[in-house]
Amino acid sequence: AVASECDGRNEAKFTRSCFISAPAQGLVYQINSSRPFSILVHCDGAFIREKDYKENHFTLTGICPGRSGLKVTKENKPEEFLFPDEPELQGVHFIGEGCVTAEGGKATGSADGILLEHVTGVEIRMAIRTSFRGFDKAYTEQYSDAQIRHMLAADLEKLSKPFEEL
């Protein structure tokens, strides 16, 4: 199902739609307007550590905090799990990638985001993958960043289909 809402502002009619595709493991967000508008697409919060914005593509990386002291089963014996001292080895890593398509106007990437100027429509497609392997392996085995990027590439390939096919 697609969630949509329409409203008007300054004599312009806006429609915003959001759809999450389970087969493609991604999100599609669309904004359409009866009049040109400008918007800055950027990502904040959510434990993001690095952001990279290009003209129509963005990549995010981060680590969700983990908890030491949880009981896990290792070699069929319960034991307490403690994260290593190195911050980059603590928690669940994630990588997100997305693309931005504009109708009309122009797009400019900067360190702050992707600025879309004088557009009548915007579509953002985004997928995120994590190092989480499941509760039974959550703290003893995680996907490597290379494995995450491989799964993410497959998701983005599926997500590149026309909207109606998702």
Predicted ranges, named:
Residues 1-166:
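Aromatic-residue-lined binding/catalytic grooves and analogous aromatic/hydrophobic interfacial grooves
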